[in-house]
């Protein structure tokens, strides 16, 4: 009788261990099923990743194209319409700044004054206009190479701005090629058709 009871207890304990082992295996299987996706799920995820990858590539391509277009727009905006307020200094004689007086006269002044402050505006690539800030008059040049001032912008107000090797600028009439803004050693304007860019009288340094 005692031997039978011991055998029953031993078998019960073994069954308990076996049952615990089975439960552990079932739980482990559930975990593995949660971690490892099914083949269909894998294919779906790969498709999703592929679509996302193409979408990202496409969006980057579009962004690059937009950046290129924006760069062109920025360049156009930079080259056309930018304004600078400067004084144009000509290093002849004692040195003169180009000035535009209210009565329409244009000349050189040794000392800086409100009439020597010019607004240099880009109107085309490499072409600018010169506007007297205080006098509210544009610098213009006629077909004879004579400078004059006008309250309204016109074709004779366009000057081609060229950077020279000495870092000075030369201002050539865009309408009448070969005529330049120039100041004599006495500060008087010279006829633009009588000078050339190799002459110091046509060299101007923009100053703030």
Curated annotation (Swiss-Prot):
Q: Which GO terms describe its molecular function?
A: fibroblast growth factor receptor binding; growth factor activity
What subcellular compartments does it reside in?
A: Secreted, Extracellular space
The answer to whether keyword Nucleus applies is: no
Give an example GO cellular component term for this record. extracellular region
Q: Which UniProt keywords apply?
A: Angiogenesis, Developmental protein, Differentiation, Disulfide bond, Glycoprotein, Growth factor, Mitogen, Proto-oncogene, Secreted, Signal
Disulfide bonds, which pairs? 90-157
InterPro entries assigned: Fibroblast_GF_fam, IL1/FGF
Q: Name one Pfam family in it.
A: FGF
Q: Does the keyword Glycoprotein apply?
A: yes
> Which GO BP annotation is one of this protein's?
positive regulation of cell population proliferation
Matches recorded under CDD domains: beta-trefoil_FGF6
* Segment forming the signal sequence: 1-37
Q: Which residues are glycosylated?
A: 45
Q: Where is it made, tissue-wise?
A: Leukemia cell lines with platelet/ megakaryocytic differentiation potential.
The organism's place on the tree of life at top rank: Eukaryota
Primary location recorded for the protein, binned into one broad class: secreted
SUPFAM superfamilies found in the cross-reference section: Cytokine (SSF50353)
Q: How does it assemble?
A: Interacts with FGFR1, FGFR2 and FGFR4. Affinity between fibroblast growth factors (FGFs) and their receptors is increased by heparan sulfate glycosaminoglycans that function as coreceptors.
Q: What role does this protein play?
A: Plays an important role in the regulation of cell proliferation, cell differentiation, angiogenesis and myogenesis, and is required for normal muscle regeneration.
Q: Which protein family is it in?
A: Belongs to the heparin-binding growth factors family.
In Swiss-Prot or TrEMBL terms, this protein is called Fibroblast growth factor 6
Upper lineage? Eukaryota, Metazoa, Chordata, Craniata, Vertebrata
